[in-house]
Curated annotation (Swiss-Prot):
PANTHER family named in the record: CTP SYNTHASE, CTP SYNTHASE-RELATED
InterPro entries linked to this entry: Class_I_gatase-like (IPR029062), CTP_synthase (IPR004468), CTP_synthase_N (IPR017456), GATASE (IPR017926), GATase1_CTP_Synthase (IPR033828), P-loop_NTPase (IPR027417)
Organism, scientific name: Wolinella succinogenes (strain ATCC 29543 / DSM 1740 / CCUG 13145 / JCM 31913 / LMG 7466 / NCTC 11488 / FDC 602W)
Record-given protein name: CTP synthase
UniProt gene name: pyrG
Keywords: ATP-binding, Glutamine amidotransferase, Ligase, Magnesium, Metal-binding, Nucleotide-binding, Pyrimidine biosynthesis
Active site: C386, H521, E523
Regulation of its function: Allosterically activated by GTP, when glutamine is the substrate; GTP has no effect on the reaction when ammonia is the substrate. The allosteric effector GTP functions by stabilizing the protein conformation that binds the tetrahedral intermediate(s) formed during glutamine hydrolysis. Inhibited by the product CTP, via allosteric rather than competitive inhibition.
Residues reported in the UniProt entry to bind L-glutamine: G359, L387, G388, M389, Q390, E410, R478
Listed Gene3D superfamilies: 3.40.50.880, P-loop containing nucleotide triphosphate hydrolases
Length: 552
């Protein structure tokens, strides 16, 4: 390997958003990084969140969407999940930071006397900390794609934009490029696409000292050449640097669309590089199988955050990955667990599989257990994740073992039958002993990150993982299955098929076609080109049993 490959001069691609939020900056960043990776480059990616929370770990799913957990136990923005899924790479805590983390770090350093009595200010101290974290994420990479959350014009984002401006000044034009994602709204009454909001957004960026080199124009329909020329002139970018990003039927189509729009040409030109040519044949094959699959299955998704499906983003994508690799469309039938409580299990009839995901709190729990019982008694393939596994154990204890008061200490701290309990000490990711109680702070006190799990010989869980005896999966939970009840449930047919340092990690029914619960979150390690084995097998078994039922 050449010295330049070992210690490359990192090139920075900053991605900002204008007009409004939720335009797809995360997908844009992931897509650009994917094309560069498939061109043979060593690519890193970073998400900056301007909110003042230290991390999203204690934020409501309705407020923020899903919390994505990295292998090293960081609770991060859901865009980190997109990055991992697109790039088929594990990222760490250094690939996502917030305003809260930046200020906390600066204030703690000031308290230790690290600034030698100086007055601490946004410029230079906060901005310098931001630049330090950006450079840290880019170490050893040929490219670092940096996504700035929020919208240009938000007061919270100003220090980060100043850091971008300073890095361009310090590193030079051949190492920094600015990509601005913006909306071209369609006025349906007139049938017109409007460029004025984009022009105003770019003007706002310029006032801060940043001129974008590439405009990503989000639109419901194709942009006429006249509008591209208008954007090119009004925003002072080359014509071929106006990249049209039409709504796509799947997010995995976006890198292919960007490749057709030739987005890598203006990037190579800015960085004074030869033509960049990605190899996307395998990616293209999988996208075709998403768009035109041979088979289909219907999976009942029994949850309680259904009004904001972003809360289950990684799991939804994991089902897509499994379907793509099986050439099967996964139809998700959304089943509100509270409606099942009040109206019964009728929505679960005629589905091919039942999935109960993770969650927190007692609301909707009875409905989830009714769904689990329905899957168990009717031999429907079932996958329970985190809370879903815990509820499967409680349902089994109540309805098979006859332990009427079986419960979780999360719902009833005084329950006489704590099937699920709060484990008060455990070894964390770094090998340190952690102690937690009901009075511990909510933030950062869960069992987080990647842990090893040993799988039981001859189990369906081990078969799902292609016979692997030891796997690594990610966790995000406070409560554990109580080993005190292990012997009783195993004698009745619900066996422990996975464990880690004495903790129950996976359960399965021995007299059922496919009924598995896992304490970990398999969705966090699923990728389009490398689907998670237990989710892939769940869809595969649902499809196989559907075909058996259809043919019989």
């Amino acid at each position: 390997m050449s010295e330049s490959k070992k210690n490359p001069e990192t090139k920075y691609i900053f991605v900002t958003g204008g007009v409004l939020s939720s335009l797809g900056k995360g997908i844009t960043s992931s897509s650009v990084a994917t094309l560069l990776k498939h061109s043979g480059f060593n690519v890193g990616i970073l998400k900056i969140d301007p909110y003042i929370n230290v991390d999203p770990g204690t934020m409501s799913p309705f407020e923020h969407g899903e919390v994505f957990v990295t292998y090293d136990g960081a609770e991060t923005d859901l865009d980190i999940g997109h990055y991992e899924r697109f790039l088929n790479t594990n990222f760490s805590s250094k690939h996502n930071f917030t305003t809260g983390q930046v200020y906390l770090s600066v204030i703690e350093r000031e308290r230790r006397g690290g600034y030698l009595g100086k007055t601490i200010q946004v410029i230079p101290h906060i901005v310098d900390e931001i630049k330090h974290r950006v450079r840290l994420a880019g170490e050893g990479k040929e490219f670092l794609v940096v996504e700035l959350g929020g919208t240009v014009g938000d007061i919270e984002g100003l220090p980060f934009l100043e850091a971008m401006r300073e890095m361009k000044h310090e590193l030079g034009l051949e190492r920094v490029i600015s990509v601005h994602v913006t909306l071209i709204p369609l006025i349906k009454a007139a049938g017109e696409l409007k460029t004025k909001p984009t022009q105003h957004s770019v003007q706002e960026l310029r006032r801060i000292g940043i001129t974008p080199q590439i405009i990503i124009a989000r639109s419901e329909k194709p942009l006429p050449k006249e509008l591209k020329k208008k954007l090119s002139l009004g925003c002072d970018v080359d014509y071929d640097s106006v990249i049209v990003a039409e709504d796509a039927p799947t997010i995995y189509q976006v890198p292919l669309n960007f490749m057709k729009e030739d987005i890598l040409t203006p990037i190579a030109r800015r960085f004074n590089m030869p033509k960049i040519e990605p190899k996307m044949e395998e990616w293209n094959r999988l996208v075709k199988q998403i768009l035109a699959p041979k088979d289909e299955v219907t999976i009942a998704f029994v949850g309680k955050y259904l009004s904001l499906k972003e809360s289950y983003k990684s799991l939804i994508e994991a089902l897509t990955h499994a379907g793509a690799n099986l050439d099967t469309k996964v139809n998700i039938k959304w089943c509100d667990s509270e409606e099942i409580e009040s109206s019964g299990v009728e929505p679960l009839r005629y589905v091919d599989g039942i999935l109960v995901p993770g969650g927190f709190g007692e609301r909707g729990v009875k409905g989830k257990m009714e769904a689990i019982r329905f899957a168990r008694e009717n031999k429907i393939p079932f996958l329970g994740i985190c809370l879903g596994m815990q509820l499967a154990m409680i349902e089994f204890a109540r309805n098979v073992l006859g332990i009427a008061e079986a419960n979780s200490m999360e719902f009833d701290p005084q329950t006489p039958e704590p099937i699920i309990y709060l484990i008060e000490d455990f070894i964390d990711q770094q090998g340190n002993k952690q102690v937690r109680t009901h009075t511990s702070p909510m933030g950062g006190t869960m069992r987080l990150g990647e842990y090893e799990c040993g799988l039981k010989e001859g189990s369906q869980t081990k078969a799902a993982y292609q016979g692997e005896s030891l796997i690594k999966e990610r966790h995000r939970h406070r409560y554990e299955a109580n080993p005190k009840y292990r012997e009783r449930i195993e004698q009745a047919g619900l066996i422990v098929s996975g464990e880690s340092e004495g903790l129950i990690e996976a359960l399965e029914l021995v007299d059922h076609p496919w009924f598995i619960g896992v304490q970990f979150h398999p969705e966090f390690t699923s990728r389009l080109q490398n689907p998670n084995p237990v989710i892939l097998t769940f869809i595969q078994k649902s499809l196989e049993l559907k075909k058996v039922d259809r043919d019989s």
